[in-house]
UniProtKB/Swiss-Prot annotation:
It comes from the Bacteria. This is 7-cyano-7-deazaguanine synthase. Its cofactor is Zn(2+). The lineage of its organism: Bacteria, Bacillati, Bacillota, Bacilli, Bacillales. Keywords: ATP-binding, Ligase, Metal-binding, Nucleotide-binding, Queuosine biosynthesis, Zinc. Belongs to the QueC family. The gene is queC.
Length: 223
């Protein structure tokens, strides 16, 4: 397998403007000389996500690619793209915010972009510890996707998942170690209802984020 055209110092970050992907952004800036961002517009529940991602990219002076993935909303009804659908968890334990094949498609397009931009590294904020029932956030899926992308383009890509084995408290700890905890707390969008920063406090994403922050700050204060 040839990788002679890939820049080992260049990374593409799958970026939504949320806590996890913004932590990955700063992780990438620490570990790679050349960082670019890719955001997918798939008709997500809150349009503000694209605006937040664009603003953060500009503030960090990073090249930002926005790709149209609106076809995702046509595949299956889900609470991330259907604004009138209440967020619920099914009998199988998978919440209706799950978008089938989302990460499969996102990583495929991120890989195609990395190929065009000569980037060896792809960074995504998926996490198995707090994977919320999403099967495409599992480590086994990411490893298989890494092999598939490399074989499909005859390039030796490396998919990085710095948050894979971290819970939310540990993700906050990582952002603190990177010196950006306050920035991420006040400028990112995790809330399913589109409230920037600490969010609405009611949706599952906000509750998970706030619980993790509280646990981290309590542990930090005890040390």
């Amino acid at each position: 397998m040839t990788n002679q055209n890939l820049n080992k110092d260049k990374a593409i970050v799958v970026f939504s403007g949320g806590q996890d992907s913004t932590t990955c952004l700063f992780y990438a800036k620490k570990h790679f000389k050349d960082v670019e961002l890719v955001t997918f517009n798939y008709g997500q529940r809150h349009d503000a996500e694209i605006e937040v991602a664009t603003r953060i990219a500009k503030e960090q002076n990073l090249k930002h690619h926005i790709l149209d993935m609106s076809l995702l909303s046509q595949l299956t009804p889900n609470a991330l793209t259907q604004h009138d659908m209440d967020i619920e968890t099914g009998e199988d334990g998978i919440p209706n915010t799950f978008v089938p094949a989302r990460n499969l498609l996102f990583l495929s397009f991120a890989g195609a972009l990395a190929y065009q931009r000569n980037a060896k590294h792809i960074i995504t904020g998926v996490c198995e510890t707090d994977f919320s029932g999403y099967p495409d956030c599992r480590d086994s899926f990411i490893k298989s996707m890494n092999v598939t992308l490399s074989l499909s383009m005859d390039k030796d890509f490396v998919i990085h998942t710095p948050l894979m084995w971290l819970d939310k408290a540990q993700t906050w700890e990582l952002s603190d170690e990177l010196g950006v905890l306050d920035y991420i707390r006040h400028n990112t969008l995790t809330c399913y209802n589109g409230v920037i920063g600490d969010g609405c406090g009611e949706c599952p994403a906000c509750q998970l984020r706030q619980r993790g922050l509280q646990h981290y700050l309590e542990a930090k204060g005890a040390n």
